[in-house]
Design a protein with these regions (language model features):
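DPxDG-like acidic metal-binding loop motif
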Residues: 57-62, 67-88
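N-terminal beta-alpha supersecondary unit
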Residues: 1-57, 62
Length: 91
């Protein structure tokens, strides 16, 4: 399972595999991405009946966009990848 994190403008999450998109979340006008990101990832996984252990890769958008949003997304992606021992890729 692949998780894509895009906080460059608002909050966008995509959960999928190589063949299809399983679940998405799009909140373009969210104010505090740093406070909502982890909770929204958990909500996305729960709505797809998945857990963190199902993730095999994380992809994160590393710009251009909101400096704070991009920094938050990259930090959360790196922490998740490190704790789950899975690869992370910035694009």
């Amino acid at each position: 399972m692949i998780l894509l994190i895009d906080c460059s403008k608002g909050l966008n999450l995509i959960l999928g595999n190589r063949k299809k998109i399983i679940q998405t979340l799009n909140k373009p006008r969210i104010k505090k991405v740093s406070e909502a990101l982890v909770a929204e990832i958990e909500n996305l996984l729960n709505s797809a009946s998945k857990s963190y252990k199902d993730l095999t890769k994380i992809i994160v958008i590393n710009g251009p966009g909101s400096f704070t949003g991009v920094r938050t997304g990259v930090t959360v992606a790196k922490v998740l990848a490190l704790s789950l021992n899975i690869p992370v890729c910035g694009i």
